[in-house]
């Protein structure tokens, strides 16, 4: 019996999104062969709310390993309260459940950060089969040691800082560097330990 697996990316961009999507697809095809169909939910939860999805095939996952961004698209617009009907009069939870049902999904993989996982948890409580894939350069998702995107962010920031050192030295200057991380300091901590 074929299983239909949906996958979405939500929230901000981070390194490794397409590599993760590709890895999931390759694992599903390797394990299940012709018994799996992958459905790409376009533009994150907005696509799930608005019924924006498409059937995907193995060719869709070729050549994306090193591409930045996400082939599925994403939206970062936060929802004030997922269960509250806002000015647009759309019951977001009901709309997402409808798309899940209309797409005949057996499971939905949600690749994202804290906000993505809060919504994924809500959908799980609503009875949908959900798998959360933690993605954020902040490395601050509860219950994980390392999230997708974190180590790449460390590597890239390290390279940038190393280059700034030479510029600062050439001009006898001190430079201040602001590092992302939202409310978590993991990225800054790792970078400071590398540059001691």
PLM region spans:
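Polyanion-binding loop/helix "lid" in catalytic or ligand-binding cores
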Residues: 158-190
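A cross-family phosphate/adenosyl-ligand binding-site feature
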Residues: 1-10, 20-104, 115
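Conserved small/polar residues in nucleotide/adenosyl-binding loops
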Residues: 194-196
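Short Gly/Thr/Asp-enriched flexible loops that form oxyanion-binding sites at enzyme active sites
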Residues: 20-24, 114-128, 188
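Short, acidic/small-residue loops that bind anionic groups at enzyme active sites
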Residues: 123-147, 151-156
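Gly/Ser/Thr-rich loops at beta-strand to alpha-helix junctions
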Residues: 11-15, 111-118, 181-185
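Glycine-rich beta-alpha junction loops
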Residues: 42-46, 137, 179-184
